[in-house]
Design a protein with these regions (language model features):
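A structural motif
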Residues: 69, 136, 141, 231, ...
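Active-site cleft segment of glycoside hydrolase catalytic domains centered on the general acid/base Glu
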Residues: 151-165
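N-terminal pre-domain/capping segments
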Residues: 2-138, 156, 173, 203, ...
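Conserved active-site loop/cleft motifs that coordinate metal ions or position small ligands
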Residues: 266-273
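A short helix->loop->beta-strand "cap" motif at the edges of active sites that frequently abuts
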Residues: 101, 177, 262-266
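Active-site groove signature of glycoside hydrolases
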Residues: 136-154, 175, 180-184
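Hydrophobic residues in well-ordered beta-strands that form the structural core
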Residues: 40, 103-105, 145, 181, ...
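Acidic/histidine-rich catalytic cores of soluble enzymes
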Residues: 71-72, 162-258
Length: 302
């Protein structure tokens, strides 16, 4: 009969051949990849879509095959008017979720603003956004990104935002879809205004989409840290890279240390907007930088 001591010696023998700490480091790396998922935003390929080089329905396959990414974010413009076409959206769902991918959110850019000063415009905007809530629900997305960038007097803007976005959030109840504000012009670039918006709405279907590069004159690091508690996803925007692989505008190591230490868990999505290199190359560079930064923040090696 094998003694307990002999069993333990045999069972742990392979570990003795590994560098000290490597087993625990691997556990840490695996845990990091369970906590965070890398996503890709379709706007990364907006020039390809506009030129016809990339068809909207082929985008999920490109993300998986060329980038090794299976968490997908969409942009409203490539849908045209087909976001309410159940067959078309069903085909897109089949090409994504059918391949084991996860649809995350849709960036919705339409003319009428949810926080417009004109009540009739707000009402039109709510009605237009309802179709995007339905589209996101059919795709299995957890959110749509909305714009609240009419600006003007902060308090009046908050009131108008609560009227328009509040009505949309009420519509979204039970859909599994949130309507999230991105810093994208007007008062929405002010993190304190965004926090006031969340407090004013106080709605389970409302949230935020922090963006590394969209807070205007505000300190981007402090702004992201403030807004992370309401984040449904995080937008890791990259524009250009230095020779050492770091991003020219944002210190990714510093920013992703903030994301890591905040307790946030979920998708960190690439949005590459550079013009000097191919979007595939830009997305891959951003992906590498995200993981490298998160690993450094966690003190693990991938």
């Amino acid at each position: 009969m094998t003694s307990r001591r002999r069993f333990l010696q045999t069972a742990t023998a392979p570990l003795a051949t590994l560098p000290f700490g490597s087993v625990f480091a691997q556990d840490g790396a695996d845990a990091l990849r369970k906590r965070f998922q890398i996503g890709i935003q379709e706007y990364t390929f907006h020039r390809w879509i506009k030129s016809g080089k990339l068809d909207h329905l082929d985008y999920p396959a490109l993300a998986k095959d060329k980038l090794g990414i299976d968490h997908i974010e969409y942009w409203s413009r490539p849908f045209g008017d087909k976001n309410t076409d159940k067959a078309y959206v069903g085909e897109l769902a089949k090409r994504s979720t059918g391949e084991g991918m996860t649809n995350v959110l849709i960036l919705v850019d339409i003319g009428d603003q949810l926080d417009a000063t004109d009540a009739a415009e707000r009402l039109r905007s709510v009605e237009e956004h309802k179709g995007w809530i339905d589209c996101a629900a059919q795709l299995g997305c957890k959110a749509i990104r909305v714009n609240c960038r009419s600006g003007g007097d902060r308090e009046e803007n908050l009131k108008n935002m609560a009227d328009g976005l509040g009505a949309l959030c009420d519509y979204a109840k039970g859909s599994g879809v949130k309507a999230v504000i991105e810093p994208h012009g007007g008062n929405s670039q002010d993190p304190d205004w965004l926090l006031a918006a969340m407090k004013r709405l106080d709605h389970p279907n409302a949230g935020l989409l922090p963006d590394f590069n969209n807070f205007g004159d505000y300190d981007r690091y402090a702004a992201v840290e403030k807004t992370l508690p309401h984040a449904v996803a995080v937008c890791a925007k990259a524009l250009n890279f230095k020779e050492d692989g770091t991003e020219s505008n944002t210190d990714f190591a510093r920013m992703l240390k903030i994301v890591h230490d905040s307790g946030y868990s979920g998708v960190v999505s690439i949005e590459f907007e550079g013009h000097d290199i191919d979007p595939i190359d830009g997305a891959l560079k951003t992906k590498e930088l995200i993981w490298k930064s998160l690993e450094a923040a966690a003190g693990v090696k991938g």
